[in-house]
Structure formats: C-alpha cells, structure tokens
Design a protein with these regions (language model features):
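Short aromatic/hydrophobic "clamp" motif used to bind/position activated sugar donors
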Residues: 160
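Acidic donor-binding segment of Leloir-type glycosyltransferases
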Residues: 101-139
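Glycine-rich, basic loop-to-helix element that forms the pyrophosphate-binding segment
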Residues: 137-155, 165, 218-228
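Short, flexible, basic/aromatic active-site loop/helix in glycosyltransferases
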Residues: 191, 206-227
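Conserved donor NDP-sugar-binding/catalytic core segment of glycosyltransferases
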Residues: 172-204, 282
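A short, conserved alpha-helix in the catalytic core of glycosyltransferases
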Residues: 55, 231-237, 241-246, 251-277
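N-proximal low-complexity "stem/linker" segments adjacent to membrane-targeting elements
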Residues: 2, 11-106
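Catalytic donor/gating beta->alpha subdomain of glycosyltransferases that bind UDP-sugars
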Residues: 55, 260-311, 341-366
Length: 451
C-alpha cells in the first residue's frame, strides 16, 4: 500500500526526526526507519511494519487505498460484500414512489451490491415503496439509531453501508472506500459529506460551513484530533464490528453516529475519513431549520460527554499555554509574554535534535492555535458565560468582540447565529443531564514523543 503524509507532518534536515499527526507527536527514527520513511514520503509501496502502524495511528500518514497488500491484509472486499441500509421516515402523504425508486437506484453507485434494505421508521402514512424493495417496517418511530439497528439485523454480508435519505451518492463511491478494508483493523470508513449546492442564502452558507463536511484532507478518526468524528449520513462499516459493540444506541436521537464511531475506536478498531469520495447532503431549506438542526447537534454533547469522558472538551491545550492565555486575557501582558518566551525556550531542549527555529515555530503555532480554540469556545459552548461577563465588564465585552471576529470574517452574522445555536443546544443538554463535560477544557502535554 502507498501512503501520503499528513499536512502537519514535517521532517528535520538530518532526516531522523519526524513531527506530525493530531495531536502533534515526535518520532525519532533509527537508520532502518529513516530509509523506510524515505520510501513513504516518495509514495513507494510499503509493507506492514511497526513504524507504519505508529505513523498511521498518530495520523501522521494516511493510506491510499488500492488493490495491493495493505498493513494486516485480510483479503479484498468488493461491492458484492455490501448491503446498503437506509433509515427512512416521512410524514408526507404525497411522496412519489417513482422518486423513491429513482433515488434507491442510485445508491449502489453503479456497483453490484448485495442488496438495499429500507427501514420505514414509523412513517404516517407508511412509505409506499416500489415493488421489489426490501422493506422493514417499524410500528412506531424510534429514531435513526433504532432504524439502522433493525436494518443491520437483516444484513448477511461482511459490510454494511448506511445512507440517509437526504444524501445523494456519486458513481463509484463504494469503490473509493472499500480499499481501506484491506487493513483488518479498519472497522468503518466515511466519505466527505459536502452540502449540495442550491439557490438561496442558506444553501450558500451550508456549502462552506456544513458541520457534516469535514474538509478535503484524509484523516484517521479519533476524539480530540483534527477529525474527531464522522457522520452516519454516509458510512461503510464491518457488520460484525458494529454488532460486537452493540450497534447504535437507540437512547440517542442525535449524536448516535458519533457514539458508535467512538465505541468502535475504544474497542481497538480504526476508523478512516476518505475525502477522495464525496457525497452530497441536502441543506436545510430555511434559517430556522438550520438553527433547529444546530441546537439538536449541540444537545447531544452532554450525553456523549457522559458516555465518553473528556471527548467533548471545548479546548485542548498544554497547561503552560493555558496560563499564558489566562494572563493575557486578564491584561497581564508582560507576564503572558514571559510565559510564552519561557515555554518556547524550554521546548528547544525537550525536542533535542529538532532545529531551534522549528521548535520555536511549533511553540508559537501551538499558542496561536489555542487562541483560536478559545475564540471558538467563547462563541459556542461558553457564550452564555461570556454574555453574562460582558454585562458587567468592559474587558469581557472587548474579548467577546475579539472572539467574534474570526466568525464575522468567515460567514458573517450567519456564522455567529450558527455557533450560538450550537451553544444553546449544549446548554440544553447540560441542564437536562447535569453533565458539565462539554464546558471543561482539557490540559495535556504537547507534542508527545514516540520512539
């Protein structure tokens, strides 16, 4: 299998130190590892090794799926090993069965899949599907988790592909994902879910800011990393792995897909994000619909934090970086500058073998990235606290204005509305459950060293 370097991955001039991944990690290479990394960086085919495994798990390199042997090769899976499961619900009595038939016909993307299972999740009136469609009817609506679980119960193939009814797939979409399953540790792979383009301001905004669109860069998926989750709107998974972790949790009406992905990862599996395959998700038709969606997404944060402690932290940074920003926000500029200078200087010997200029750049980049996280948190999970502080403090008002600037320059007032709606959902979940996890920052060392 061949690999590409993550955008964060860089190598020192001597060639025996690699820094990369999410969060950043430092790898010291022996001579054999240096030679192997040369081949990785050149795009040559590389077999399984401990170095490859560590770099993949760190998110420092990403596999390029092909028909060749990958790490831990178990055989090639094809579209014939895939059953597509569609959770469906509608309260529209005029829904056209012909339109259903046309949409269902696109799901295989031109590939000969084993079958398609539609789960009618208590629609009123019941969905009228074309003859020949494999249909499971639920007596009452149980939500997408319950519907997907009923679909999985019908699956006899090695892989199951979940596709929501508001998703449009492209030809060959399965072929672009199946190669990842050459690695037997991979339990699930998700494509990029871009927002479908359309007329109107909402569609234009969603095209650039959909929470389902995780960007153009490949990633290993893990909580607290650059790509911390993937949506279940389009997801291909090993059927046995899904069953082994208990399937989707029907108690979650939103966030059930994130919960499943994190349980797969906790069970020792890998989950991959493959943006080389793009499907399209229908945007909300109105601003009120978008706000309701974002509130629903935020509402799942508290329950997810209770199930997966530490995963929903609004900011992640080192303790020294947190101190520097706390001093800066308190107006103690000289002390903040002193902490930044001291921690930057201390990082140079810690990263022995890394050029001083590189160490300084990493330290300053880390401090700046923490500032962006703080601004995001101030607009999202923390905004009610910021708003209260702004009522009584001129400094808080200035800081709130600074936190709003990144959003205003990338989406304008609509972005502020988006962030605030998510924050409303977070607080709704907190008040309902009493779980404060989505508010607490997480402090950690950076970068970690790997040998």
């Amino acid at each position: 299998m061949t690999f590409v370097l993550d955008r964060s991955t860089q190598r020192t001039r001597r060639g025996d130190v690699v820094i990369g991944g999410s969060p950043l990690r430092l790898f010291r290479l022996a001579p054999a590892g240096t030679a192997q990394f040369d081949r990785l960086a050149a795009g040559d085919t590389v077999g399984a090794s401990k170095l490859v495994e560590r770099l993949v798990d760190a998110g420092a390199i990403h596999p390029v799926p092909d028909a060749g042997a990958g790490p831990r090769q178990t055989g090639t899976l094809t579209a014939a090993d895939v059953t597509i499961v569609v959770p469906a619900w509608s309260n529209n009595p005029d829904l056209d069965p012909g339109a259903w038939n046309a949409w269902l016909g696109t799901l295989p993307g031109g590939a000969p899949v084993a079958g398609v299972v539609v789960v009618d999740d208590g629609s009123r009136p019941p969905l009228a599907l074309p003859p020949g469609v494999r249909l499971v009817r639920r007596a009452r609506n149980g939500g997408p988790a319950a519907a997907r679980n009923d679909g999985v119960a019908e699956v006899t193939t090695a892989l199951v592909a979940f596709v929501d009814t508001d998703v449009t797939v492209t030809d060959g979409w399965l072929d672009g994902l199946l190669g990842h399953f050459a690695d037997d540790r991979v339990a699930a792979v998700a494509p990029r879910v871009a927002s479908a383009r359309g007329p109107g301001a909402v569609a234009r905004y969603e095209a650039a800011h959909s929470p389902l669109d995780l960007g153009p860069e490949p990633a290993r998926v893990a909580p607290g990393t650059r790509v911390g989750y993937v949506p279940g709107a389009a997801l291909v998974a090993r059927t046995d792995a899904v069953r082994a972790v208990g399937g989707f949790d029907p108690a979650l009406r939103t966030g059930e897909d994130v919960d499943l992905v994190w349980r797969l990862i906790a069970a020792g599996h890998r989950v991959r994000y493959e943006p080389g395959v793009v499907v399209h998700h229908a945007p909300r038709p109105t601003w009120s619909g978008l706000v309701r969606q974002r509130i629903a997404y935020g509402s799942s944060a508290a329950l997810l934090a209770r199930r997966h402690p530490g995963t929903l932290a609004p900011v992640r940074m080192s303790g020294w970086t947190a101190l520097a920003w706390a001093l800066l926000l308190a107006g103690r500029l000289r002390l903040a500058a002193l902490v930044v200078a001291a921690t930057t200087a201390a990082l140079v010997p810690k990263l022995g073998g890394v050029p001083a200029a590189t160490s300084v750049r990493l330290a300053l980049t880390g401090h700046a990235g923490a500032g962006r996280q703080l601004a995001d948190a101030a607009r999202r999970a923390w905004w009610p606290l910021v708003a209260v502080a702004a009522l009584v403090s001129r400094r808080a008002r200035r800081l709130a204005a600074l936190a709003a600037l990144p959003a205003l320059t990338d989406g304008g007032l609509h972005r502020l509305l988006d962030d605030a709606a998510y924050g409303v959902g977070v607080w709704r979940g907190i008040l309902t459950t009493g779980e404060l996890g989505p508010l607490w920052p997480q402090l950690r060392d950076w970068p970690r060293r790997q040998r």
